[in-house]
Regions:
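Active-site mouth loops of central-metabolism enzymes
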Residues: 7-21, 79-87, 168-178, 279-285
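N-terminal beta1-alpha1-beta2 module of alpha/beta enzyme domains
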Residues: 1-68, 72-73, 168-170, 346-351
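Flexible, glycine-rich active-site loops centered on histidine and acidic residues
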Residues: 2-16, 82-149, 192-193, 199-201
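N-terminal small/glycine-rich loop or linker at the start of catalytic domains
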Residues: 1-15, 71, 113-116, 155-168, ...
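An alpha-helical appendage that flanks or caps ligand/catalytic pockets
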Residues: 125-161, 202-305, 337-351
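Hydrophobic faces of well-ordered beta-strands that scaffold small-molecule active sites
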Residues: 3-7, 38-40, 74-76, 104-108, ...
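Conserved, mostly hydrophobic/aromatic
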Residues: 3, 42, 65, 96, ...
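Glycine-rich, proline-tolerant flexible connector loops at the mouths of alpha/beta enzymes
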Residues: 37-61, 80, 112, 199, ...
Length: 351
């Protein structure tokens, strides 16, 4: 198992620079500790999620972070394609590929509630139709040796091209919802499936099953190692200490994101911190408890390649969050490294 970071920025600082500096501090630390990749949240197209310190342009942040780090790969998590012209996205990605010396990963998605978002006007096409065509057009712009004509359902043009072309063959991550079509497209194109921390363990298992089946259909050897799964992870001395540091901040965020966990007829009062720990959304406590929690989820879903630690939040203090990352990489990650989701499973005698 590899370890990555999902910098899911949500600190509610009055000054954006304060949050950006803290996010940079975490990325720099992650790079020093050997964390392999970081996906940087891009929030700027959905009115209900607006905060004074949100990051509406992850690419700019990534280019600055690249000058302060050595090995970590970074990508936006994600660019909502229906709100941009695909050639602009293709160009932005190519430039970032050059500016990061090939450490840039493209991150695409439909966007949260794209159809009802009026901040940039009403979309004239179905957002998923726009997303699919945008992906095809971006790939064409990256790969076409000569200017090309495009006559799609959404975009049309003649002699299109981008300058510069990408320097490398970038990895592309797709924000995967529980939609079959998104997971199937991800497998069809050979992209990386990015799974947020909000799906239940059962939903992650189902999403991985759809992805693996779709990989098989396109004739590829299905590889669970390409799947990225996010979870809130916090390492300290005890579960009690973790609850004290995490409870207020994370419950406030969870109320807006975890409605699917509330039982029929229930309310936010059912989203207790203890229940969210029991359901595997928050994995916290001493190193052994954290390892066991991650291993249990890994086994329940059938394995995955990269665990994305959720950062960019306002729980505890910056020092506590950094200490958690340091302890995780020193005391938990080495034990997880032995997990290989693509290794054939050997059935026990009891089975």
């Amino acid at each position: 198992m590899q370890i990555g970071l999902f910098s899911n920025g949500n600190r509610n600082n009055a000054l954006a620079k304060t949050s950006y500096d803290e996010d940079l501090h975490e990325i720099i630390l992650a790079d020093r500790l050997g964390i392999s990749e970081a996906w940087i949240s891009e929030h700027g197209t959905f009115l209900a999620y607006q905060r004074p310190d949100q990051l509406p342009s992850a690419d700019l942040f990534i280019c600055k972070a690249a000058t302060l780090t050595k090995q970590i790969r970074m990508g936006p998590g994600i660019r909502p394609l229906p709100f941009f012209h695909p050639l602009q996205i293709a160009t932005d990605c190519a430039v970032c590929d050059h500016l990061t010396d090939g450490r840039y990963m493209a991150g695409f998605g439909v966007g949260i509630n794209a159809q009802s978002n009026k901040q940039r006007g009403t979309l004239v096409h179905d957002p998923r139709t726009m997303f699919r065509e945008a992906v095809d057009l971006i790939l064409k712009a990256w790969e076409a040796p000569e200017p090309f004509d495009w006559n799609g359902a959404v975009w049309q043009g003649e002699k299109w091209h981008i300058i510069p072309k990408p320097m490398t063959k970038m990895e592309v991550g797709i924000a995967c919802s529980r939609s079959d079509t998104t997971l199937e497209l991800t497998a069809e194109k050979g992209f990386l499936p990015l799974m947020s921390w909000t799906p239940t363990v059962a939903q992650v298992r189902e999403m991985l099953s759809i992805y693996m089946s779709s990989e098989h259909k396109r004739g590829a050897v299905p590889a669970r190692s390409r799947a990225r799964v996010g979870r809130v992870v916090y390492v300290c001395d005890s579960v009690a200490e973790a609850k004290r540091d995490l409870r207020d901040a994370e419950l406030a965020h969870a109320y807006n994101r975890m409605q699917h966990v509330i039982p029929p007829g229930g309310s936010n009062a059912d989203l207790t911190f203890e229940k969210l720990i029991d359901r595997g959304f928050f994995i916290c406590g001493d190193p052994d408890t954290v390892y066991d929690g991650i291993k249990n989820i890994y086994d329940e879903v059938g394995g995955f390649g990269t665990l994305l630690l959720i950062y960019g939040k306002d729980w505890g203090t910056l020092e506590q969050r950094c200490r958690s990352m340091e302890r995780f990489m020193a005391e938990v990650a080495p034990r997880l490294a032995a997990l290989n989701p693509d290794k054939p499973r050997v059935a026990s005698a009891a089975e």
